[in-house]
Amino acid sequence: MSARAGIIVTGTEVLTGRVQDRNGPWIADRLLELGVELAHITICGDRPADIEAQLRFLAAEGVDLIVTSGGLGPTADDLTVATVARFCGRELILDTELEQRIADILRRLMGRRTDVDFDALRAANRKQAMVPDGATVLEPVGTAPGVVVPGSPTVLVLPGPPRELQPMWRTAVQTEALRSAIAGRTEYRQDMVRMFGLPESGLAETLRDAERDLAGFDRLEITTCLRRGELEIVTRYEPDAEPVYRNLLTLLRDRHGSAIFSEDGSLVDDQVAALLAGHTIATAESCTGGMLSARLTERAGSSAYVAGAAVCYADAAKVELLGVPADLIADHGAVSEPVAEAMADGALRRFGADVAVAITGIAGPGGGTELKPVGTVCFCVRRADGRVVTRTVRLPGDRSDVRERSTTVAMHLLRRALQDG
């Protein structure tokens, strides 16, 4: 049986939704990489009683390792270390060497500021140097150190800011206390297949057939997720079950080969970036308001291939900035394939790009008609050599869903156009 772990994300700001939890999913992925089975992720506020209740719950579940995030700062509500010490039956002691290292960090952070009472600041941060007796101290990335408290279960206490937590994790997994806690781990492999254009019901039917027909199917742990209009199929298995996974992959290829765009977990964004090497792209957007160009420029190095973008929401902007004929809009409507094609052609010329993508649609909640209901979106991908692809789709969901899914459709149309050479 594999080692099991639980995660406690602390912080009232996370519990109430003011701050999105980024640590829980990140730690979950790292545990998976280590071959540790994740039993629970819990979120609680800053009250010590609530934190201790979560610790006791996970201990009762029989986990070997508990990972906490948050509550390591110098303020009054940062009480995770003290709570963990009490839970583990350990006395808090002042680590004078750690206190000095924290003071050195504070001195560097303050620099030449003369308006700060350094002694008062140091005193306020002294609580960060109080650690459970017998714990392994993890060097601070900011000012807050982490600790590993050995026991049954072992508790790893990490800071809340991801920029501090993630580097500290790499140190934590090298400690003897943590490695001992997960010594019974089972090595797993994980593979991800991504699909686009296949409804969840179609995949569900295939997986039901696989469960019935594939020998050893029960050795695969499969999770599916619909994200940005794409299907993600994540399969986790022990190494000797690889032939079973290969048989599943063959079945997926046979039934849904045209929908599969990634078998190695790569995103369509990664693929488009690679395909644009040596080329330049321009975008012309209406209903998405620049979301496609934002997505294209999320990746470092995108300046090598993104030539420019035009957001033309009003019809007049389409005419003035992209040269879309006014009579074309009058004859076909702003949401039409002819107008999308003219927008792409205008972007291609204005920015001197090799390829252009245009989006025009009705995101809602108003503006729809019987012929063009809310969710109707028209796309065009035009190449400088004259090749062109146009498409009209009707996307489900609210305004936000339609806009986000529109960018995904555009990325896949672009991917296919670039793959065709």
Curated annotation (Swiss-Prot):
One Pfam family it belongs to: MoCF_biosynth
SUPFAM superfamilies linked: CinA-like (SSF142433), Molybdenum cofactor biosynthesis proteins (SSF53218)
Cross-referenced CDD domains: cinA
Superkingdom field: Bacteria
Coiled coil segments of this chain: none
InterPro entries the record matches: CinA, CinA-like_C, CinA_C, Competence-induced_CinA, MoaB/Mog-like_dom_sf, MoaB/Mog_dom
Gene3D superfamilies: CinA-like, MoaB/Mog-like domain
Family classification: Belongs to the CinA family.
Matching HAMAP family: CinA_B (MF_00226_B)
Protein name: CinA-like protein
Organism: Mycobacterium sp. (strain JLS)
